[in-house]
Structures are given as structure tokens and as C-alpha cells.
Amino acid sequence: GYVVNASSENEHLVVNGMSNFARDGINANSAVLVEIKPSDYYVNSPLDGLNFQRMIEKKCYNVGKDYGVPVQRYIDFKNNQITKEIGKITPTIKPRYIYANINDILPKWINDSLKEAIEAFSLKINGFNCDDAILTIPETRSSSPIQIKRNEKYLATKYIYPIGEGAGFSGGIMTSAIDGIKCALKIIEEINRGE
């Protein structure tokens, strides 16, 4: 797989993982997500989650400037030191990457959660915590930081059906498709009842 730049705002940085059809790249990739609750970022606005996301994206951009993506070997992440050179795994991010200490970029509780998760995954997937594994940040768009309110009929207001990732009801292609199917079934149900 590959990690690609998925930034959508000037001077903000976002990455995402992908694979070509054959899935025969030199690396495998996976996203390790950390649960972030409103209590982790809420100040006084429904947009505080978006502001928290943007703060991380801006901080990552500032570390790399000109879209250099922060990367770090897992052993260096664990030892809280900047990576000086890559090991047996080469980052695939384009256009360029920059060695950084992720511990200095993300909040401590996120770093602690990532380390705990990577070690836990290694108990099920041998080598997941390989010293030379490359961490690439930030993948901040795995789910929406806001959620549009809707009722049991999937309506936000008459004829407006907020569904899928952008509306905050799913976190990927499959869950978006499922949410869309559920919404379509509700619409069909209403049409059949003459509503």
C-alpha cells in the first residue's frame, strides 16, 4: 500500500492510505485510529471538533513546510526520539517526507493510545510493532468531527437526508454505503405509506 497526501486546505496536512488494484506495493499499510471524545476537545462550540482536527493538520504542516509529511520509525516513537534514518521499510508518501518526533506533535494521550494499540495489535499480527515500521501522520479524516442532526426518518429537515461520512454517520466506504441503503429504505417506506 501507499500513504498519500489527502490535504484539502492550504497550509494544512492530511494523509490517507490506499492500495493499487493488485495490492502488490512494497509496503503494507494500515491506519491505527484513536478514539477522540467531545470531552477531549470541547470548549464551547459545536465546531470545536473541527477546530481540534484543523489544529493537528496545521501543526503537522508547520513541521514539514511545503507538505513534507512527518514520519517516524516505531522504535524512535516508543523511545521519544527523532528518526535519523530509515530502516528496512521505506516510506511511500509523496511528494516528500520529513523525519519528526510524533511525540512532540500530537497530544500525549493520543501518543500513549497509539503505542498501546500498536503493541496490542502485535499480539495478533506478528511484526505489527516492528522497530522499523513507519508511522506517518496525520490521518485526521477517518470520520467527521461534526454530526448533522437527523430524526428517525433520516431527515434533518424536509427533503434533506444527511447520510454518510460528511454528515458524521459513517467512517468509510462500506459504512457510508450501509447508511445510504438504510436511508433509501426509509424513503421507500415513506413513499409506500403515501407520506
Predicted regions and their residues:
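Active-site-proximal substrate-binding core of FAD-dependent oxidoreductases
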Residues: 74-77, 154, 186-195
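Residue-level signal for secondary-structure boundary elements
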Residues: 82, 86, 122, 126-130, ...
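Flexible, glycine-rich terminal cap/loop adjacent to redox cofactors
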Residues: 43-47, 166, 178
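A glycine-rich dinucleotide-binding beta-alpha-beta segment and adjacent secondary-structure elements
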Residues: 97-170, 177
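A conserved FAD-binding loop/helix module that cradles the flavin
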Residues: 167-191
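Glycine- and aromatic-enriched mobile tails/lids
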Residues: 25, 42, 158-159, 166-169, ...
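An anion/pyrophosphate-binding glycine-rich loop and adjacent beta-alpha core
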Residues: 1-100
